[in-house]
Curated annotation (Swiss-Prot):
Subcellular location: Cytoplasm
GO terms assigned for molecular function: identical protein binding; signaling receptor binding
Source organism of this protein record: Bos taurus (Bovine)
PANTHER family for this protein: PDZ DOMAIN-CONTAINING PROTEIN GIPC2, RGS-GAIP INTERACTING PROTEIN GIPC
InterPro entries: GH2_GIPC (IPR055349), GIPC1-3_GH1 (IPR056814), GIPC1/2/3 (IPR017379), PDZ (IPR001478), PDZ_sf (IPR036034)
Subunit (UniProt): Probably interacts with SEMA5A.
GO biological process, one term: regulation of neurotransmitter secretion
Keywords of this entry: Cytoplasm
Protein name as annotated: PDZ domain-containing protein GIPC2
Family annotation (Gene3D superfamilies): 2.30.42.10
Length: 313
């Protein structure tokens, strides 16, 4: 009988051990992390704006990387690309590609065309030009004001890249530096602009002055790919209507005070101020993120007013 008891105890011990081992195994299986979801593959269709076959680009995180990908598809140097428009091959300043691309957007790359030199007499302080840049070192004309000095020079067009001012090469300059240079030109003197037109299909497109542009919906869907100068690109929701309206107003202030338009810069300024409690905090945030611009105080207060209005909507 004692032997039988010992055998029974031994049997129970094995069974218990087996059960405990099984419980540990199940727990270990349950605790294993689930495999990561496969990365979302984002592919965009692209053409050269003056005409080409359709190519495909993917795996880019910045404007520079995108230009390099497009250049690789069409076997041209990246430096040939002036800028890109979304969903239209026309030189439409309201459709410029910036830091955000709708996931269904079609990318048209505008490349260098005819180079020209134009002499302009600065009879007034304001030339009537609004400057922007492509994020990769090329500044170009985004708007020409009606009845302005530049408007009277019919060979200067919206979309023209400004390569040099009075022989000084400005490739690599940001738009605000170019606008400042033009503003500082002496009144009652002649100056020379070296310009490069975007290549056109048959050199038949009419001159455009580019009316008031709107930030509008960037993509055709509800998500966009946001490009960054540092770090990976991210997929984000399309901004709300109230946010888009506020960003458009900030862009208007950039044009009024600095002679530039830049939706990406306006967006950065809005993001810097949306969680700040007063204009002093906002000014500090701008200095930390955009200190190179040296914005005038009155401009900062006006932008703060726009952000404050957006918070109340």
């Amino acid at each position: 009988m004692p032997l039988g008891l010992r055998r029974k105890k031994k049997f129970n011990t094995k069974e218990t051990s087996r059960l405990v081992e099984g419980e540990h195994t199940d727990a270990a299986v349950r605790s294993l992390p689930s495999p990561p979801a496969p990365a979302r593959r984002l592919v965009f269709h692209t053409q050269l704006a003056h005409g080409s076959a359709t190519g495909r680009v993917e795996n880019f995180s910045s404007i520079q990387e995108l230009y390099a990908k497009i250049a690789g598809v069409f076997e041209i140097p990246p430096s040939e690309i002036l800028y890109c428009t979304l969903n239209t091959p026309k030189v439409d300043m309201g459709k410029l590609l910036g830091a955000q691309i709708g996931l269904e957007d079609f990318i048209f790359a505008h490349i260098k065309g005819i180079k020209k030199e134009v002499n302009v007499y600065k009879s007034e302080d304001s030339l009537g030009l609004t400057i922007t840049d492509n994020g990769a070192g090329y500044a170009f004309i985004k708007r020409i004001k009606d009845d302005s000095i530049i408007d009277s020079v019919k060979t200067i067009c919206v979309g023209d890249h400004i390569e040099a001012i009075n022989g000084e090469n400005i490739v690599g300059w940001r738009h605000f530096d170019v606008a400042k240079k033009l503003k500082e030109l002496k009144k009652e003197e002649l100056f020379t602009l070296t310009l490069i037109e975007p290549k056109k299909a048959f050199d038949m497109e009419p001159r455009s002055k580019a009316g008031k542009s709107s930030t509008g919906k960037i993509g055709t869907g509800r998500e966009t790919l946001r490009l960054r100068s540092k770090g990976p690109a991210t997929v984000e929701e399309v901004p709300s209507e109230a946010k888009e309206k506020a960003i458009g107003k900030v862009d208007d202030l950039l044009e009024l005070y600095m002679g530039i338009r830049d939706t990406d810069l306006a967006t950065t300024m809005f993001e810097a101020g949306k969680d700040k409690g007063n204009p002093d905090e906002f000014a500090v945030a701008l200095d930390e993120t955009l200190g190179d611009f040296a914005f005038p105080d009155e401009f900062v207060f006006d932008v703060w007013g726009v952000i404050g209005d957006a918070k109340q909507e």
